[in-house]
Amino acid sequence: MVENQRAMPQPEMRRIRRIHFVGIGGVGMCGIAEVLLNLGYEVSGSDLKGSAVTERLESFGAQIFVGHRAENTVGADVLVVSSAVNTSNPEVATALERRIPVVPRAEMLAELMRYRHGIAVAGTHGKTTTTSLIASVFAAGGLDPTFVIGGRLNAAGTNAQLGTSRYLIAEADESDASFLHLQPLVAVVTNIDADHMATYGGDFNKLKKTFVEFLHNLPFYGLAVMCIDDPVVRDILPLVKRPTMTYGFSEDSDVRAINVRQDGMLTFFTVLRRDREPLDVSVNMPGNHNVLNSLATIAIATDEGVSDEAIVQGLSGFQGVGRRFQVYGELPVEGGHVMLVDDYGHHPREVAAVISAVRGGWPDRRLVMVYQPHRFSRTRDLYDDFVQVLAEANVLLLMEVYPAGEEPVPGADSRNLCHSIRQRGQLDPIYIERGVELAPLVKPLLRAGDILLCQGAGDIAGLAPRLLNSPLFVGAKVASTEGKLK
């Protein structure tokens, strides 16, 4: 379906004509707004500044306001807000005063899912990639799903799209427990880790119970697809009173991977499924964590009747997601070039998975890493884990912590991380103060054949394109969306 082709609004929401998003440029908001636009609703939204995202929505017919003001809500039948927006926001305050409904983004997503065949992907890590893989395999199988993803699906050029089938594939966000709004027919749990613990009062058992509650939102005829390689997911499995299908490398998995082999960006493996012939597949992403993401996809696709041919095609043709081990291109250095990679990972487990993928696909190459921790609270809570995993790089440059609205926490900053990593004796990290231009610092450290990884969830997101366009790297080669050099 053409992305901006208009469909009919949902009859169940016939009283709603104009929907206003507060913070419409956010990654969790813009996708829902785009789907609603394509369903025929009037959409408006505000954000603190314009962006490529808001320009895209404007091109589809959304009315965009820069800044938050009470008058932006005129004509709105409902306001959609993210968890970062509170009642002190002038638009929210005005809506409440005028008795205009104010709903969390997850509740609006739940309404889109309510009358569709919903597939919700939850878990601390791997949600975006797994959701994207499912959408790609379903598309290869001719099912034309609607999808709402927390990252840019390279093949589609967007993080959301309205399909013609009843399938709706979306991420389920545990960071604020808003995934409890969703009532899908199929739910995935990739893993459960200690992150966003403030939402759960610092109680890991409460986090585990919330995931069980999420799975119990499934109907009795639904399906919970669970990765039992993760010890916490395995731990909650007996508590889930819904039909389940398990996946992983474990021998007791319902869907299992064997014979994994990695060759650069390509990963090859064989899938074993109960009462099925073995299936040989490949995916254009490195690392065992992406094998697990692929297994979740294969489990759901098999259960939904997608053919093996479409599964193989959808996985092998997958072009990746923005900032998930995204190969940006090559930087010229003396004697050759350096592969430039950008990645969103910001939890020690995600960092470890990416480093493992680099070692598996390019065992003879050095890893030069520029890393930016995200949030002081996360750095504090997972400090020792960060020290251990970041010490595995060959060369490490640490940018200062991206605060994401938090106040500094004593001891939980990048200068202290550098000191702790240095004490391990494996490498001597370089501390980067805020505002320092990276290209002149990075270039002397690079050797031909290196892999340069820019990783983190903060404003490091703009570093890879800046390096690619830096006058210090004249002749840099840009990669296509498939990670191939143009």
UniProtKB/Swiss-Prot annotation:
The keyword Cytoplasm applies. It comes from the Bacteria. InterPro entries: Mur-like_cat_sf, Mur_ligase_C, Mur_ligase_C_dom_sf, Mur_ligase_cen, Mur_ligase_N, MurCDEF_pg_biosynth, UDP-N-AcMur_Ala_ligase_MurC. Its main location: cytoplasm. ATP binds at G123, T124, H125, G126, K127, T128, T129. Pfam families: Mur_ligase, Mur_ligase_C, Mur_ligase_M. GO terms for cellular component: cytoplasm. GO terms for biological process: cell division; cell wall organization; peptidoglycan biosynthetic process; regulation of cell shape. Its EC number is 6.3.2.8. It catalyses: UDP-N-acetyl-alpha-D-muramate + L-alanine + ATP = UDP-N-acetyl-alpha-D-muramoyl-L-alanine + ADP + phosphate + H(+). GO terms for molecular function: ATP binding; UDP-N-acetylmuramate-L-alanine ligase activity. Keywords: ATP-binding, Cell cycle, Cell division, Cell shape, Cell wall biogenesis/degradation, Cytoplasm, Ligase, Nucleotide-binding, Peptidoglycan synthesis. Cell wall formation. This is UDP-N-acetylmuramate--L-alanine ligase. It comes from Pseudomonas syringae pv. tomato (strain ATCC BAA-871 / DC3000).
